[in-house]
């Protein structure tokens, strides 16, 4: 893996990922089919929305490298993506965090699980402060709750 001329070999160690928000946060929209709050039609929701307050810290769910940190015009607003490498089955794991108020990391930076990567906000297609959190396996969306602890 090469970013800005530096080569990395990433391995996702597996296990439970860190919740990307404060403990007091709550899921405001689950993964799967839902009535889109802005478009008003039934659509698949590719992640989970976790509510909170503007400026709340958003944490890296696992160790990795920042591969995207910018405003996304496709509706995600301020967005960060982290490549966590390949798991033991050779599946590439990437997490996505969207609608941030302020981005705190740049492409190519390494992060540890629990590092603050952005501040929660409501940028892009959003109805209030939250983080939209996705987990992707080889580019395909999966339910993030499968990776997160129950509490």
Describe each PLM feature range.
Residues 1-77, 113:
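Surface-exposed, glycine-biased beta-strand/turn segments
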Residues 28, 56, 95, 123, ...:
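Ser/Thr-centric signal marking residues that sit
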Residues 30, 69-70, 100-103, 120-123, ...:
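Residue-level recognition of beta-strand microenvironments
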Residues 33, 52-54, 86, 101-102, ...:
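Non-catalytic surface loops within mature trypsin-like serine protease
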Residues 43-46, 60-102, 129-134:
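Zn2+-dependent peptidoglycan hydrolase active-site motif and core
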Residues 55-58, 102-109:
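Short, surface-exposed secondary-structure edge patches
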Residues 76-84, 89-91, 107-151:
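Conserved, short, structured surface segments that act as functional micro-motifs
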């Amino acid at each position: 893996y090469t970013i800005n001329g530096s080569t990395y070999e990433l391995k996702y160690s597996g296990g439970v990922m860190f919740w990307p928000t404060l403990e007091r946060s709550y899921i405001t929209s689950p993964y799967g089919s839902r009535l889109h709050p802005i478009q008003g039609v039934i659509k698949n929701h590719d992640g989970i929305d976790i509510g909170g307050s503007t400026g709340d810290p958003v944490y890296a769910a696992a160790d990795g490298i920042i591969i995207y940190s910018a405003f996304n015009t496709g509706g995600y607003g301020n967005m960060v993506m982290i490549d966590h490498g390949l798991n033991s089955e050779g599946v590439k794991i990437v997490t996505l965090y969207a609608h941030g108020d302020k981005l705190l990391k740049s492409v190519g930076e390494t992060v540890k699980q629990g590092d603050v990567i952005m501040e929660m906000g409501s940028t892009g297609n959003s109805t209030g402060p939250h983080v939209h959190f996705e987990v992707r396996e080889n580019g395909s969306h999966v339910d993030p709750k499968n990776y997160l602890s129950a509490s």
